Swiss-Prot record:
Record gene name: GAGE12F
SMART domains listed in its UniProt record: GAGE
Subunit details: Forms tetramers.
The protein, known as: G antigen 12F
Top-rank lineage group of the source organism: Eukaryota
Residues covered by region (Disordered): 1-117
Family indicated by similarity: Belongs to the GAGE family.
Note: This gene belongs to a multigene family expressed in a large variety of tumors whereas in normal tissues, expression is restricted to germ cells. These genes organized in clustered repeats, have a high degree of predicted sequence identity, but differ by scattered single nucleotide substitution. Their sequences contain either the antigenic peptide YYWPRPRRY or YRPRPRRY which is recognized by cytotoxic T-cells.
Length: 117
C-alpha cells in the first residue's frame, strides 16, 4: 500500500532581507517647520489653505441650509451607517469585526428573544 497523494507540508520560503533606511541624523522639529507653520503666500499668488475635507463640507452646508430651518443631526452619527442598535453588523470599512469575548457574551433567558440582523 503506497500513498501517492500530495504532501501537505510546504517548505518555508526564503525570507527576503530588506535594508532599513539610512539614518542621516537626529530628527529635528526645524526640518518639519512647514507642517507646523504654513508658509504665507506672496502677494501675486492666490492664497490656498489646507483644510480638512469634512471641515470644508461643513462650511458649505452652513451656507446652503441657512434659510432652511434647523439642521438634521447627521453629524452625531456616522454618515452612511445609521445606528440600528444591532451590534453584529460589519465595521465601517466593510470588514468583519472580531468575534466578541465569550466571557462577556450573555445568553438570552428563556422568555427573551435576541434580535437578529
Amino acid at each position: 500500500m503506497s500513498w501517492r497523494g500530495r504532501s501537505t507540508y510546504y517548505w518555508p520560503r526564503p525570507r527576503r532581507y530588506v535594508q532599513p533606511p539610512e539614518m542621516i541624523g537626529p530628527m529635528r522639529p526645524e526640518q518639519f517647520s512647514d507642517e507646523v507653520e504654513p508658509a504665507t503666500p506672496e502677494e501675486g499668488e492666490p492664497a490656498t489653505q489646507r483644510q480638512d475635507p469634512a471641515a470644508a463640507q461643513e462650511g458649505e452646508d452652513e451656507g446652503a441650509s441657512a434659510g432652511q430651518g434647523p439642521k438634521p443631526e447627521a453629524h452625531s452619527q456616522e454618515q452612511g451607517h445609521p445606528q440600528t442598535g444591532c451590534e453584529c453588523e460589519d465595521g465601517p470599512d466593510g470588514q468583519e469585526m472580531d468575534p466578541p469575548n465569550p466571557e462577556e457574551v450573555k445568553t438570552p433567558e428563556e422568555g427573551e428573544k435576541q434580535s437578529q440582523c
